[in-house]
Curated annotation (Swiss-Prot):
GO terms for biological process: 3'-UTR-mediated mRNA stabilization; cell differentiation; G2/MI transition of meiotic cell cycle; positive regulation of translational initiation; regulation of female receptivity; regulation of translation; spermatocyte division. InterPro entries: DAZ_BOULE_RRM, DAZ_dom, Nucleotide-bd_a/b_plait_sf, RBD_domain_sf, RRM_dom. This is Protein boule. Interacts with the translational regulator orb2. Residues 33-110 form the RRM domain. Residues 151-178 form the DAZ domain. It comes from the Eukaryota. It is found in: Nucleus; Cytoplasm. RNA-binding protein that plays a central role in spermatogenesis. Required for meiotic entry and germline differentiation, at the transition between G2 and M phases of meiosis I. Acts by regulating translation of specific mRNAs, possibly by binding to their 3'-UTR. Essential for translation of twine (twe) mRNA. Required for the expression of various genes such as CG6784, CG17210, CG15841 scpr-B, scpr-C, and rho-6. Residues 193-228 are annotated as: Disordered. GO terms for molecular function: mRNA 3'-UTR binding; mRNA binding; RNA binding; translation activator activity. One of its GO terms (cellular component) is nucleus.
Length: 228
C-alpha cells in the first residue's frame, strides 16, 4: 500500500482552503479498535467517514460529535473491526483530506473526569466551604458559610443567602425593692394634717369637721369623784 503524499501546512496552502484540525486529548484511557478524527467540516456526514476510511480496513461504526443544537463540533470517532486496522491507519494516514479539509488522525482516548469541575459554577465562580469558629454564647450560629471567589474581574459573583435572624434572649432578674408602708384610710383621716386643708370649701359636706370627743385628764377625774 502506498502512502498518501504529505500535504503542505494549512498556512502555506494557496487559497487557504484547509483549516487546522482539532487535536485529540492527551490524558485518559486508550480505547482499542477506535481512532480520533479531527478537523471535520460542518457538512460532513458519518456516511462520508465510512466511505473514506473503508480504504484502510473494515469500518465497524462512525460517530460525529454534535452539540445540543445538533451542530457538528468538528471531530468524531471511527471504530474498526480489529486493533491492527486502527494502528495501520495511524501509521499510513499521514494526510487524509475530506471536503478540502485535512483530517487529524490520532488514538481515541477517553478523558478522565476532572474532580474540580463539580465546584465550578456556570458563571466561573468557585465555591469553598469554610467552618465558622466555635460559638461563645447560647445564640446558635450558622453551620457553614459559603465564600465566593471570582476568577477574574468582570465575572458576576454569586453571593450566599442572608444569614438567619435570631431573636435576642433576655434573662429575668428578680431585684428586691423597698415598698412603702400603706396605712389604713381611717388612720390617715384622723391623724394626717394634710387631709384638713384650710382652703377647702366649708359648705362641702365632706369638708366639715367632725365634732371631737372631749379629752379628760386625771386631775379632772379626781374632782368629780366623791370625797370620803
Amino acid at each position: 500500500m502506498h502512502k498518501i503524499a504529505a500535504a503542505p501546512p494549512p498556512s502555506a496552502t494557496p487559497g487557504g482552503g484547509l483549516e487546522t484540525p482539532l487535536a485529540a486529548p492527551k490524558y485518559g484511557t486508550l480505547i482499542p479498535n477506535r481512532i480520533f478524527v479531527g478537523g471535520i467540516s460542518g457538512d460532513t456526514t458519518e456516511a462520508d467517514l465510512t466511505r473514506v476510511f473503508s480504504a484502510y480496513g473494515t469500518v465497524k461504526s462512525t460517530k460525529i460529535i454534535v452539540d445540543r443544537a445538533g451542530v457538528s463540533k468538528g471531530y468524531g470517532f471511527v471504530t474498526f473491526e480489529t486493533e491492527q486496522e486502527a494502528q495501520r491507519l495511524q501509521a499510513d494516514g499521514e494526510c487524509v483530506v475530506l471536503r478540502d479539509r485535512k483530517l487529524n488522525i490520532a488514538p481515541a482516548i477517553k478523558k478522565q473526569p476532572n474532580p474540580l469541575q463539580s465546584i465550578v459554577a456556570t458563571n466561573g465562580a468557585v465555591y469553598y466551604t469554610t467552618t465558622p469558629p466555635a460559638p461563645i454564647s447560647n445564640i446558635p450560629m450558622d453551620q457553614f458559610a459559603a465564600a465566593v471567589y471570582p476568577p477574574a474581574a468582570g465575572v458576576p459573583a454569586i453571593y450566599p443567602p442572608s444569614a438567619m435572624q435570631y431573636q435576642p434572649f433576655y434573662q429575668y432578674y428578680s431585684v428586691p425593692m423597698n415598698v412603702p408602708t400603706i396605712w389604713p384610710q381611717n388612720y390617715q383621716e384622723n391623724h394626717s394634717p394634710l387631709l384638713h386643708s384650710p382652703t377647702s370649701n366649708p359648705h362641702s359636706p365632706h369638708s366639715q369637721s367632725h365634732p371631737q370627743s372631749p379629752c379628760w385628764s386625771i386631775e379632772d377625774l379626781r374632782d368629780t369623784l366623791p370625797r370620803v
